[in-house]
Amino acid sequence: MSKLGVLLTICLLLFPLTALPMDGDQSVDRPAERMQDDISSGQHPLFNQKRRCCGEGASCPRYFRNSQICSCC
């Protein structure tokens, strides 16, 4: 029984130290850079400026956060 207790103690001590990331290893959330990487619907190759929607057969308009989007974009 003592061998099982020693093994359990070792596992409980080693697992959290190696499995959980440290604060320095976590990446920083940069929402401004994410916004620059997003392509606007006007620049999307499938966007039809005249219809303000994507090509034929697209179910338009859909709205997300007060912005009109297409189902294909």
From Swiss-Prot:
Cysteines engaged in disulfide bonds, as pairs: 53-72, 54-70, 60-73
Function: Shows a paralytic effect in fish.
Reported tissue expression: Expressed by the venom duct.
Listed InterPro entries: Conotoxin
Domain of life: Eukaryota
Compartments where located: Secreted
Record GO cellular component, one term: extracellular region
Family: Belongs to the conotoxin M superfamily.
Name assigned to this protein: Conotoxin CnIIIF
Recorded domain comment: The cysteine framework is III (CC-C-C-CC). Classified in the M-1 branch, since 1 residue stands between the fourth and the fifth cysteine residues.
The UniProt record lists the keyword Signal: yes
Signal peptide: 1-19
Residue ranges of the propeptide: 20-51
Additional information: Found in injectable (milked) (IV) venom.
GO function term, MF aspect, one: toxin activity
Keywords on record: Cleavage on pair of basic residues, Disulfide bond, Neurotoxin, Secreted, Signal, Toxin
